[in-house]
Amino acid sequence: MGVSRVVTTLPPDPAEKTLPVPELNMEVQAQKGFNVIATANNRDKGVNELSSALMRRFNTVVLPLPATMDEEVEIVDRRVAQLGRALELPAEKPALEEIRRVVTVFRELRDGVTADGKTKLKTPSGTLSTAEAISVMTNGLAMAAYYGDGAMHAGDLAAGLTGAVIKDPVQDRIVWMEYLQTVVKDRNGWKDFYRACHEVI
């Protein structure tokens, strides 16, 4: 549902807890406990700005990104393990090193600088959130389970990672290619990662 559609169908007074359904020529009364939850992020604002009157009807909760690399790696590791069990993926739990590599890529591209602070980087248009890192890792786990040998390798992560970074096919592709060439290619122990991601592009 697009933003403009949400704006036109939300009740003018949320206290009424009634939602009109014009297509059915009726109104639906909310049950006890009903809530509308809207999510957003600071990089993807959509096409239509919400009015300040509408925004005041929501409680705003800001979830900052994890402060440290270790904290983000721990969150991704825990959630990927939970999702792997829930989805009953017959693959080995990903090595912490693979999670650390994905989180490193996300953090460096988000921050616009390498972890050592020596190289400035262009930032892509996407958010590269922790949730996306979890998604990339879970996708890699599924790839390893169903198309690989059950152990996660760089090739299992390459497509998901490239898709997470490249949202704009022109600008983000340039950002990703530059990052691969200037950072990943010469990084110690990342040759397999570089080759796998380069093959996807």
Predicted segment positions?
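Non-catalytic, well-ordered alpha-helical scaffold segments
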Residues: 4, 8, 100, 131-138, ...
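AAA+ ATPase "lid" subdomain C-terminal helix
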Residues: 108-116, 130, 134-154, 163-170
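C-terminal engagement/docking regions of AAA+ P-loop ATPases
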Residues: 145-201
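Canonical AAA+ ATPase core
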Residues: 1-9, 14-88, 141-143
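Short acidic/histidine-centered micro-motifs embedded in hydrophobic/aromatic stretches
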Residues: 13, 105, 157-160
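Conserved C-terminal "switch" segment of AAA+ ATPases
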Residues: 45-49, 60-125, 146-150, 188-199
